[in-house]
Amino acid sequence: MGNVLAASSPAPPPAGSPPVPGLVSVPPGFTMPPVAGLTPTPDKKEPQEERLPNPGTFEECHRKCKELFPIQMEGVKLIVNKGLSNYFQVNHTISLSTIGESNYHFGATYVGTKQLGPAEAFPVLVGDFDNSGSLNGQIIHQVTNNIRSKIALQTQQSKFVNWQLDTEYRGEDYTASVTLGNPDILVGSGILVAHYLQSITPSLALGGELVYHRRPGEEGTVMSLAGRYTAPSWTATLTLGQAGAHATYYHKANDQLQLGVEFEASARMQDTSVSLGYQLDLPKANLLFKGSIDSNWIVGATLEKKLPPLPLTLAMGAFLNHKKNKFQCGFGLTIG
């Protein structure tokens, strides 16, 4: 009961006195045995089980490594961002190309007032409209603390091309999501994608992907399994399935340098490739450099330079394909 009795037997209580709560009453003529030699011990608290973290989404498994690789640039691009309020922003994009068609895009973004974190607010509405009449739109909303939904649609010259509905549920130590793409009840076609990712330990997460597609005269299912191990300075991810294998390794050398290795094997194309990418961040110089090289002897690099106090960002990129003897370069300017 947490109480320690004195070494000497206590004097018997006077007759008729009520028993002291919390103590066992002693019958008349009996004495308590001596308890000398017992030392008080502090109450021991049972160790609490460490809760496993949420592993994120299945689509984020390879993202850390993918973000290190430069994005191919070609031609000249001008982007102008303008914030009209704390919730609404528009942007204009002009792209001039010597290979493809030059185009103009107008985009708008609305962020709602449902604040869930320092950088998260819902609902989010994103739209992009180009000079040919094509439209890309997304609506993202946090329905509850655990459920997030997204609707995306794409039109091309006033005709619906793609649309999909995503629903994601985040538990304490797992994430499950379902995506329905281009469903057509009359024709009997559509794509269904299911993802599940579970934290096994604080460092290890395992999951799987199921893709079911159906259209007239064709029906099939593709499955794949994924595993990700996260350490303080590196992350290794492996995805195995009927379509092939995909493995990435991300390593953070220091605050300025990050490295990534990617391996891809396609069972349908009977082809494999290995890529090495790195990112060098120099905050004092407002400089960000990304470079990559792969087994097909394609070398690429991009350089981004911010020009404070002006709201300007310069971007330059170049890619060289040694096998095909092709070279592409691009230049971009972002205002705002």
From Swiss-Prot:
Coiled coil: none annotated. Residues 42-52 have a biased composition (Basic and acidic residues). One of its GO terms (cellular component) is mitochondrial outer membrane translocase complex. It is found in: Mitochondrion outer membrane. GO terms for molecular function: porin activity; protein transmembrane transporter activity. Forms part of the preprotein translocase complex of the outer mitochondrial membrane (TOM complex). Interacts with mitochondrial targeting sequences. This is Mitochondrial import receptor subunit TOM40 homolog. The gene is tomm40.
